[in-house]
Amino acid sequence: EGSPIKSVKDLVAAIKADPSKVVFGAGGSVGSQDWMKAALTARASGLDPKAMRFVAFEGGGEAITALQGGHVQVYSGDASEAEEQIKAGAKIRVLAVMADKRLEGSLSGIPTMKELGYDVQWPIIRGFYMGPKVSDADFKAWSDTFTKMMATPAYDKLRAERGLFKFALTGKELDAFIKERMATYRKLAADFNLRVAQ
């Protein structure tokens, strides 16, 4: 609430002025999805992510508590998680989202990083995954069930209420998308000198 960082422009200026005074915090360790968001923001600011200060917490709730207490200056977690904390009374400010377009719901007024002039996108994809030994028939049955569910008005309403962007891939299309994202992640991990299991 009392943070001098009120916009992405302020955040970038603070990082450039003295990166040691800008501590990122999130649920997840170095190399995690939330760390990657912080690293991409640091890189967009001209800072080598290896020089970035990052505190890993057990989860987003702990990180948001640390943010409110001034122990970290930036929370690089899920927008939907921040939204729930704001609804519960947390005094935090969402600066931008890393999706390709604005979210719906209560976060619809929050700009994307791209809108603000930073080519940074890192949407978190949530899904249900099955093991490799599941039969084709069972895989298709589950895929069809999720496809039908995601086409309902009730699902669309719930998704919008949770600040989640529209994303309705299932089956082979989702599998291909995840493999493409993993290739991007592996390249970024190599750029950031992280080791990734093959």
Predicted regions and their residues:
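Short helices/loops that flank or line small-molecule/ion binding pockets
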Residues: 15, 40, 61-75, 80-90, ...
